[in-house]
Each structure stands twice: as C-alpha cells, then as structure tokens.
Amino acid sequence: MISNIYEFLDKSVAKYPNKTLFVSGKNCISYLEFSHKSSALASKILEFGLNKKPVLIILPKSIEALIAMFGVARSGNFYSIIDEKMPFERVQKIINILKPALIITARDLGANNYDIPMIYSDEFDSFKPNLSLLSRVEIIDTDLLYVLFTSGSTGEPKGVSISHKSVIDYTFWVSKTFDVGSDEILVNQAPFYFDNSILDIFTTVRCGATLHLLSTFEFAFPAKVVEYLKTHGVTMIFWVPSVLIYFAN
C-alpha cells in the first residue's frame, strides 16, 4: 500500500533509473538523478528541524521547482507553490495565512525581503542525501502534501489543503482510466500553482513516463507548440478546453 507520493518515485527509479523523467527546454533529468537531488534537498530541509511544517516555494515552472516539491514531500513536510511574479503584498498575505517555516526560491526573485529562513535553488547541487535523517521521516497517507492558494470569493487568498492520499487515489484513477504506461510522453501546460498540473506530474512519476514542461511564453505560438508535440512524439496531453479550442482555431 502506498502511503506517500515519494513511493511513486522510488518504484519508478528502481525500474527506470536512467530514463528521462522531466524535460524543460534544453534541460532534462533522469529518474535516478531527480531522486538523488530531491532526497538531498529533503536532507537539507530536515537540518532545519522541520516536521510536518509548511514550506513556501517561489520558483518558476522548472525542474528546480519539481525538485523542491518532491524534496519537501520527502522530508515529511508540505509545500505551497505560488506564482513567482505575484505582487509582494499578495505574497505577504499568503505568508500571513500559511506561516511557512522555510522558503525555497531563487536569488533573483526578491524573496529575501521576508524574514524567513531561505534555501536557494542554485544551492541544490551542493546538497547531499543524509540517509540517517531521511530514515527517521515518517509519513502517513493522511498527512498534508500541499496547500493550493486560490483567490477565494472575496479576492483574498484562500488555502486548500490536499493530503498524500488524495493525490495517490487520483493518480491511480488517472493511470487506470486512461491506461497510462511507461512509454507515454506527456506535455505540461498548467502552472504548478494550478491543480491541473497534479495529473501531469504525479501520473508521469507513478507510471515511469516522461513529462515535458512548456512555458506560458511558448504557448503563445500554437504552430510552434504543435511542431514540438510532433518532434518529441507526445502521446498524452491534459489541457483545459479553452486551450484546446485556442489551438484548434
């Protein structure tokens, strides 16, 4: 029985260690390398003494953001990822609600204005897995995985809490319903702070597939996106109807 989403990664690493997991522009990362980097980040997070605490991620859609998400999950804490272009005032409102114990961000995004401990993405490569710390982490399926912030009916940030179990059950349902296999090549359109991205990310990891990340800028050129899908042999997309209509027209 799966108790946390990191077990999806562990199982796929055992089967497909050298297979490409994520592709972003000219950058790509294998299952084994991704597991190593996210475990190393988890170890660094654990050095802060955090357990089941909120961690705020302020990063653009990237492989580094995914390492941050899985690193937080592996450490037994839970994350909230937000738009890196969000105005300072709104970020502060989210911080006041979430009360993060740690922020993971990039140095050029100005998050050092917040009086909260930081980990910067350019430090990831310097971290090493600490098996002693990692072995002490205990996660059950009802533990929180992430908090998704929406505008809410009043325009004020509203956090929606999602457990490991919710994502595990959803991922199993998607995999079975759409017969997703390890030979699938998916493309992610939704930002990571939208719940549509959950299908792309965790279904890919669970099934041993490959996920390509496309930026908002790239989606402004439909002809180039279609050519990208052809060139890379994409077999599965999960896009909202408005995007599909946009491409059809």
Indicate residue ranges for each PLM-predicted region.
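Short hydrophobic "strand-cap" motifs at the C-terminus of beta-strands
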Residues: 25, 82, 147, 189-190, ...
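Adenylate-forming
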Residues: 60, 108-109, 190-193, 217-218, ...
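Conserved AMP-binding/adenylation subdomain of ANL enzymes
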Residues: 158-187, 195-236
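Short, well-ordered alpha-helical microsegments
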Residues: 64-66, 88-91, 197, 222, ...
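Hydrophobic packing residues within well-ordered alpha-helices of enzyme cores
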Residues: 68, 111-113, 174, 198, ...
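Active-site beta-alpha turn of Rossmann-fold NAD(P)-dependent dehydrogenases/reductases
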Residues: 59-60, 148-151, 184, 190, ...
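Acidic donor-binding helix in nucleotide-sugar-dependent glycosyltransferases
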Residues: 64, 71, 184-185, 200-203, ...
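Carrier-protein-dependent adenylate-forming modules in NRPS/ANL systems
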Residues: 1-165, 178-179, 208
